[in-house]
């Protein structure tokens, strides 16, 4: 018996509830933006890896281990509303290296597109703009938002509340008893 042939699946939605299409790390955003990394992401699975070199020399370029994969994941969590972007030690190192630095992203939340920018060092206000890209947010500034209001303004808080209360839609195929 082929169980998959029996399932009659209909999509509940065309897009994920939350996804990031672009993440940009800035050394500074004004007067002239200096981009350190500009990372395009796609819906679905994005694999983050760093190739290891054959060179065991401690002065060789960083690769594989200590290449920033965990920091990247922490920055993703930060643009999604987490209050920190690393351990205390790592945040201090980043703030020292990038006192005017920030991370920005194009985020999609419950069908709405947002451009966001969050600081590493100077200033604790984040900036958001609906129906905009990171580039447009930099040009037009967007609205300043405190850390406490950030998830609520983007709709992330309501989405998390729905997840906690079980208000998210379940497809009938997943609730059907197995025979």
Predicted features, each with a name:
Residues 1-114, 118, 126-128:
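Extreme N-terminal "head/tail" segments of very large remodeling/mechanoenzyme assemblies
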Residues 122-179:
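Glycine-rich phosphate-binding loops of NTPases
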